[in-house]
Amino acid sequence: MSDILEKILATKRAEVAAGLARVPLAEMRARAEAAAPARDFVGALRAKRDAGRPAVIAEIKKASPSKGVIRADFRPAEIAASYEKGGAACLSILTDAEYFQGSADYLKAARAACTLPVLRKDFMIDAYQVYEARAMGADCILLIVAALELPAMQALEALANELGMAVLVESHDAAELDAALTLRTPLQGINNRNLRTFEVSLDTTLSLLPKIGPERIVVTESGILAPADVDTMRSRGVNTFLVGEAFMRAADPGAELARLFA
């Protein structure tokens, strides 16, 4: 495991402990169970694909460890509405504060400003975070194979499903993908960014494609910056994209989405 990932996970363990001290598990579970029903994340992606359109999970991200602040003028509700107008299928919203300058409040504001299903993009390691995700309004969570042992990953998926949420499982290499494919979720994310080096290569998705059956939805993540990148993926049958930085650097994120996926 990379130094940056290990550092992030240590922060997450501390955050879970602090969260439990602030809001006990039973209370967080009650909040999750009382939340408004989840929106259909997988259904929204399939609807775009069935219509012959690329399904875009548009990301709302202020900063990252590798790039620093990406968007200084950061208004999550306006960005969410812009993405919906631009044709996004779903949203991905960073809630990690320490490394990505994210917030649960950003997720709540963005979800309230549109009708799109929302992914809580964070480093999930504990059941507490899954209850927390549903309580804040998330419709889907991210599970990163590099960050989790298989039994823990399977348990977190089961809990998310029990609460009505979808799961996007993320892998980066063949060994991680083998673990990811043991989960029930159809959403198989392939991160083109190596979390150990932060280098990006679209070949990561293309090389792993043959291992994934047609019943799954392959989500290519990171490095989609130009229409040629989209064309490369679609020509190989990849029609679901998670894109953040290319949109966040544009004056009008939704217009950039519409342009990139025209």
From Swiss-Prot:
**Main enzyme class:** lyase
Q: Which SUPFAM superfamilies match?
A: Ribulose-phoshate binding barrel (SSF51366)
Catalytic activity, reaction form: 1-(2-carboxyphenylamino)-1-deoxy-D-ribulose 5-phosphate + H(+) = (1S,2R)-1-C-(indol-3-yl)glycerol 3-phosphate + CO2 + H2O
Keywords (alphabetical) are: Amino-acid biosynthesis, Aromatic amino acid biosynthesis, Decarboxylase, Lyase, Tryptophan biosynthesis
Keyword Chloroplast (UniProt)? no
Q: Which GO terms describe its molecular function?
A: indole-3-glycerol-phosphate synthase activity; phosphoribosylanthranilate isomerase activity
Pfam families the UniProt entry points to: IGPS
EC?
A: 4.1.1.48
Give the family from UniProt: Belongs to the TrpC family.
Q: What is this protein called?
A: Indole-3-glycerol phosphate synthase
- Which source organism? Thiobacillus denitrificans (strain ATCC 25259 / T1)
Record lineage: Bacteria, Pseudomonadati, Pseudomonadota, Betaproteobacteria, Nitrosomonadales
